[in-house]
Design a protein with these regions (language model features):
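Short beta-rich binding modules
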Residues: 1-123
Length: 123
């Protein structure tokens, strides 16, 4: 199992794709999601609940445009959104955190920088 992350309330842990980690205090007057998007240089965020196994409210904000996708239609009612090309470097640490909460055998990787914060700190 991977080393769990520890994040203080009212802070954002940024994990860069190169492996560096930085803790940034949340700014008053700036929504935490907006601050996270700026910190990880993302136009659109997606959130992964990574604290479920430890019973915390930690969420990981990832760049929703970090992958190029294709839509595969299996039948009239079943479509698949398939990642085909990374637009940013693989973030090994974020991928490990993601795989810890996924079903065994998951191979999808997290790309680019990520921001981790407490969901309760996001209004």
């Amino acid at each position: 199992m991977t080393r769990a992350v520890s994040v203080e309330h009212k802070t954002i842990l940024v994990i860069r794709a190169d492996g560096t980690e930085t803790v940034v205090p949340m700014l008053r007057g700036t929504p935490p999601t907006e601050q996270a998007a700026l910190l990880i240089r993302a136009d659109m965020l997606d959130f992964v609940r990574i604290g479920l196994l430890e019973g915390t409210d930690l969420v990981m904000a990832v760049d929703d445009n970090g992958w190029e996708y294709e839509v595969v239609q299996h039948n009239e009612q079943h479509f698949e959104h398939r990642a085909i090309k990374a637009r940013k470097p693989i973030n090994q640490r974020a991928t490990e955190l993601y795989h810890e909460i996924c079903k065994p055998g998951t191979t999808h990787q997290i790309v680019g920088d990520v921001a981790i914060m407490h969901d309760g700190d996001v209004p």
